[in-house]
Amino acid sequence: MVNSRAKGHNFENEIKHDLFSELGLKFQRDLNQYRQSDLGDLLCDDPSWPFVIECKRYAAGCQPKTAWLEQARRAARAVDLYPCVIYKYNHQPIRVSIPFAALAEALGGTCDEPELADLSFFGFCFVARELMSVRAAV
């Protein structure tokens, strides 16, 4: 049997390194997540980072669980950022769930719909880069 905490820790580290490779931004695990509720899993050293990241690694499934999305929403609401769930199931690629509003803002628009976009990891990195660029230009 796999230790779920170790599996989560390893996935958070994998994502931390992948984000650095793609975006050049440093992330660290938020160790307070075990002591306090409504915190994300990874913290970015860049204060303009627009997301609270929740990482989930599970054996089977095909989409993010509602509880994960709610957890990310609560954490994001507390710090006025966009929620983001980065998840992976065995034998499937990493996927990322973000609000339509984040995608719209990255493309120069707005969106009030509560819908979520499910992106590839690289698609998410594109949106994050564009969103940070749009905000820096304001």
Each model region followed by its residue ranges:
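Catalytic phosphate/metal-binding cores of nucleic-acid and nucleotide-processing enzymes, i.e., regions
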Residues: 1-138
